[in-house]
């Protein structure tokens, strides 16, 4: 299922705009967030055809999602009481409405003294972290949850491609907390 919004720019136009934003912000590397949103010409749930399609590109320096200490020593995680949505609203797009669950999950984790939350699907299997895909590497095998309840985005696809290039076996399967041990 697609969200059915026609972006009025080509991939080439968007790529050039992202490069220009990085240059304007004096960034050699950083985080780029292109967003697509509908205008305000009309109100209501059925007014999509009457609304303009807008695109904005933000970029900023962001050295790492976790601090360097976390990379060296690991982080503490908790099992979130918040359940992950079915394949984020049946779309392989990042949709802002699906972040509500993740925000509640990570805030709950922090209130419990952990750095991150792991969300489960409706069947009790691991879906993903509050802001990241989850991968386990054991015995030259990369394991990751199926895409039924996680975002199958660029990052996930890139990690899988890199793992295959490194000759790791890649297994997409239902994962439990016991698999993390």
Predicted feature descriptions by range:
Residues 27-35:
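Ordered, amphipathic secondary-structure segments that act as subunit-interaction surfaces
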Residues 1-24, 43-181:
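Helix-start/capping segments and mature chain N-termini
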Residues 37-42:
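Short, internal active-site loops enriched in acidic
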């Amino acid at each position: 299922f697609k969200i059915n919004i026609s972006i009025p720019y080509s991939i080439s136009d968007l790529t050039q705009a992202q490069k220009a934003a990085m240059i304007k912000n004096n960034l050699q590397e950083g985080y780029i967030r292109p967003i697509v949103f509908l205008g305000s010409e009309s109100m209501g749930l059925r007014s999509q055809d009457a609304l303009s399609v807008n695109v904005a590109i933000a970029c900023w320096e962001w050295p790492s999602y976790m601090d360097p200490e976390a990379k060296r020593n690991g982080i503490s995680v908790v099992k979130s009481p918040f359940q992950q949505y079915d394949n984020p609203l049946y779309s392989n797009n990042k949709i802002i409405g699906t972040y509500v669950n993740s925000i509640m999950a990570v805030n709950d984790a922090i209130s419990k003294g952990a750095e991150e939350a792991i969300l489960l699907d409706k069947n009790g299997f691991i879906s993903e972290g509050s802001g990241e895909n989850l991968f386990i590497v054991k015995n030259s095998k990369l394991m990751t949850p199926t895409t039924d309840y996680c975002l199958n985005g660029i990052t996930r696809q890139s990690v899988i491609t890199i793992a295959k290039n490194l000759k790791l076996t890649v297994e997409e399967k239902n994962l439990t907390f016991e698999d993390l041990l």
